[in-house]
Amino acid sequence: MAHKKGGGSTKNGRDSNPKYLGVKAAGGSTVSAGTIILRQRGTVIKPGTNAGIGRDHTIFSLVDGVVTFRNGRNNKKQVDILPS
């Protein structure tokens, strides 16, 4: 019989790398064409006027202008770029 219990391994001890999601350019800020406005998982916020969407659902600016957030159809948030 064992005098001490075996030192078993733990099931914890892992951590995933940060993904740096979220808004990168706030509403009212000036952006140039190609600037990333927000990174997200899925289309939580949809692109509106003068905004494009990438393969990973990243929303970016298509023109130079000012970022505005608004509620679009079905109360879904949208990002627009007002050209400057």
UniProtKB/Swiss-Prot annotation:
Record Gene3D superfamilies: 2.40.50.100
Record carries keyword Protease: no
Membership in a protein family: Belongs to the bacterial ribosomal protein bL27 family.
Annotated spans, Disordered: 1-21
InterPro entries: Ribosomal_bL27, Ribosomal_bL27_CS
Superkingdom per UniProt: Bacteria
Gene Ontology MF terms: structural constituent of ribosome
Organism: Chlorobium luteolum (strain DSM 273 / BCRC 81028 / 2530) (Pelodictyon luteolum)
Protein's name according to its UniProt entry: Large ribosomal subunit protein bL27
Lineage: Bacteria, Pseudomonadati, Chlorobiota, Chlorobiia, Chlorobiales
Keywords: Ribonucleoprotein, Ribosomal protein
UniProt-listed GO biological process terms: translation
Record's GO cellular component terms: ribonucleoprotein complex; ribosome
